Amino acid sequence: MVENLDKNIETFLKPISDSITGFVFGSFSFFGNQIPFIVLWLVFASLYFSFYFRFVNIFYFKRALNVAFGKYDDPSHPGEITHFQSFTAAMSGTIGLGNIAGVAVAISIGGPGAMLWMIITAFFGMTLKFVEVSLGHKYRIIHKDGTVSGGAIRYLSDGMGQLGYVKLGKFLAIFFAICCIGGSFGGGNMFQANQAFQQIVEATGSENSPLFNKGWLGGIVFAFIVGFIIIGGIKSIGKVTERLVPLMAFIYVFSCLYIIISNFGLIPETIYKIFSSAFNLDASVGGFLGSLIAGVKRAVFSNESGIGSAPIAYAPAKSNNPVSYTHLTLPTTCT
C-alpha cells in the first residue's frame, strides 16, 4: 500500500488538475495553435501599463534597488516588516524551480524561441506587478494590533466598491481567495516540493535511492519545515527570507554563470537559435505562436506578474506611500 501511495495520489489528483488547467487556460484556435484567453489578457495588460506609466520599469529601476535595500526605510511608518524583508519574501517565490523547470518546459514545448518571449514578458510584466502591488498596498488594512491585511482580496472588494460595484468586488475577492488557496497547494507547494524531492532522489542513487517512490515522505518533511516558519506569521517569514534568500540568490546566480562560462563557445549558436525560433512564422509547434504562448505561460509562473500573489507579500511592509514603496517590485520580475 505504502509502495503505491505516490501512484495513488497522482491518480487521484491528475483529473482534478487537468480540469482546473482546462478551465484557467480556456483557449481558442488560431492558425493551428491554441491561444489561452488569459495569456492575451496578461500580454495586453502588461503592454498597456508599461506605456501608461511611461516605462517605469526602465526609468525607476535604480530607485527600486535603493528602496529594496533599505535606503528609504522608516521604522515609524505603519506595517510589520522592512522593505528588504518584503522584497526577499517575494523573491523567495520567484527564484528557483519556476525559473529552472519553467524554462526547460517552455523550450521543450515552444522551442528555443520561447526563452526570448519569457524575457520580453518579464520586461513588460515588471510594470504589471508594480501596478498590482501598488493597489494591494493602497487598499491594505492595518488592524489595531498592528497586523496588516492586504493583497488582491482587498483591492478587488474595496477598490471595486469605491467604483460602485460592491457585489461584483466581493464576488471577485471571494473567487480570488478560493483560487489562491488552490494555487498555493498546486504551483506553490506540490510542484516545488515534487521537483526538489526528485533532485534529492537523483543525488542519492536514483532508482536505487532509499527515498525512491517515497514522494509522500518528502512532502511531509517539507510541510513540517515550511509550517514551522509560517506559523509565526509574516514577521517570522521575513526574518527567515532576509537571511536565506540572499544565499539562495548567490548560489543561483553563481550556478548560472558557471554553466554559461562552461559552455561559452556555444553562446553565439544558442543566441541564433533563440531568435530564429522566436520569429519563425511557421504554423508548427515550434513556430511563432507556439513559442510566444509557451514563453508567456511559463514566464507568468516564474515571475508571478499579474496573478495576485505578490501584493500579499508586499502589503505588510512599513511604508506610507504605496507608489514610492512598490518600485521595489521591479527587480523581482527579472529573476
Give the predicted meaning of each segment:
Residues 39-45, 82-90, 165-182, 218-221, ...:
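Select transmembrane alpha-helical segments in multipass membrane proteins
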Residues 107-114, 140-149, 161-163, 315-325:
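Juxtamembrane helix-boundary/capping and inter-helix hinge elements in multi-pass membrane proteins
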Residues 41-44, 49-65, 172, 193-200, ...:
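Membrane-interface loop-to-helix entry segments
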Residues 1-97, 107-114, 125:
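N-terminal alpha-helical transmembrane segments of multi-pass membrane transport
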Residues 326-332:
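Conserved small/polar residues in nucleotide/adenosyl-binding loops
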Residues 241-245, 249-321:
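Acidic, glycine-rich loop-and-beta core segments that form the ion-binding/anion-interacting portion
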Residues 64-75, 142-159:
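Juxtamembrane inter-helical linkers in multi-pass membrane proteins
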